[in-house]
From Swiss-Prot:
Transmembrane spans: 1-21, 32-52, 67-87, 98-118, 120-140, 194-214, 218-238, 253-273, 274-294
Keywords assigned by UniProt, alphabetized: Cell membrane, Membrane, Transmembrane, Transmembrane helix
Membrane association type: Multi-pass membrane protein
One Pfam family hit: TerC
A Gene Ontology term for the protein's cellular component: plasma membrane
Protein name: Uncharacterized membrane protein RT0774
Length: 302
């Protein structure tokens, strides 16, 4: 029953998103984007209350912790998505269409990765320690890297697409696939969609590794992941400005990843309850936001 309720909510949100709010290919206003993302955030929080009533306080804490971590980590690939759109010269009017179908792919791929990961961890529990090393290494690396970059032309996926598919250099409206002379051609919209899906899968490895350290409940992991991504995709059109404004969030995320990595190594000696993980996550993010605001105010007053 819980799965039916979740998928019903997601289906309703997707229908609302593409069928009503973005039925026409128009540029999404900043205020509309913020409002829609806030709407998704409220729905996500209400779903956490539903989990609390049906599964208990600890599961609700795990849900909110996973949700916030996924939200923060998903911010990291916004720049790369923006680079992909710029590279293929995708107009703003069509970007939402690509992101929407990207969400459909994420819903499928996340399910495969999460179920596969849970099965592997149950069979090979030592994999958690590998995840811990990945998380700590990623956290340390985040402190030393100012911006993520993505070399599209030299990426394996892009080269494979160009080599094996008929690609058009120009857009034909909002079409992903075009038929010419009994041949199928794929537009830049299609190529950008494939690259974004690939990026989502790569980024999912870090985020899922972090969340496995919080809980191994498939329902909590999957629902928190999907709700976090839904809200971010709707906010994409103003997110570059927000990410620039909150430039220290990445350091908050680095601290969270390192904390979770050490939590995995210490779980045999110290049982860290869900409320501590949630407290560390919220505190780290708030400190990052406050530090970012203070930095921006100092720059503005110079």
């Amino acid at each position: 029953m819980s799965w039916i309720i979740f998928y019903t909510i997601i289906a309703a949100l997707l229908i609302l998103d593409l069928g009503i709010v973005h039925k026409k290919n128009t540029v999404i206003a900043f205020k509309s984007s913020v409002f829609l993302s806030l709407f998704y955030f409220i729905i996500s929080c209400l779903f956490g209350i539903y989990i609390y009533h049906n599964m208990g306080l600890d599961h609700a804490r795990e849900y909110y912790t996973c949700f916030l971590i996924e939200k923060a980590m998903a911010l990291d690939n916004i720049f790369i998505i923006s680079i992909i759109f710029q590279f293929f010269k995708i107009p703003t009017t069509y970007q939402h269409r690509v992101l929407f179908f990207g969400i459909i792919g994420v819903i499928i791929f996340k399910a495969i990765i999460i179920y596969g990961g849970i099965m592997l961890i149950h069979k090979f529990s030592w994999l958690l320690y590998i995840f811990a090393v990945i998380l700590i290494a990623t956290g340390i690396k985040t402190f030393n890297v100012s911006h993520k970059t993505y070399d599209i032309q030299n990426s394996y996926i892009y080269k494979s697409i160009i080599k094996n598919l008929n690609i058009t250099h120009n857009l034909e409206g909002h079409k992903f696939v075009i038929k010419r002379n009994n041949k199928l051609y794929f537009s830049p919209l299609f190529v950008s969609l494939i690259l974004i899906e690939t990026i989502d899968v790569v980024f999912a490895i870090d985020s899922i590794a972090a969340i496995f350290a919080i809980t191994n409940d498939v329902y909590i992991i999957y629902t928190s992941n999907i709700f976090a991504i839904l809200g971010l995709r709707s906010l994409f059109f103003c997110l570059s400005e927000i990410v620039e404004r909150f430039s220290y969030i990445k350091y908050s995320l680095a601290l969270i990843l390192i904390f979770i990595g050490f939590k995995i190594f210490m779980h045999h000696y110290i049982a860290i309850p869900a409320y501590i993980s949630l407290t560390v996550t919220i505190t780290s993010l708030l400190l990052g936001i406050i530090a970012s605001i203070m930095r921006k105010n100092m720059i503005d007053h110079k």
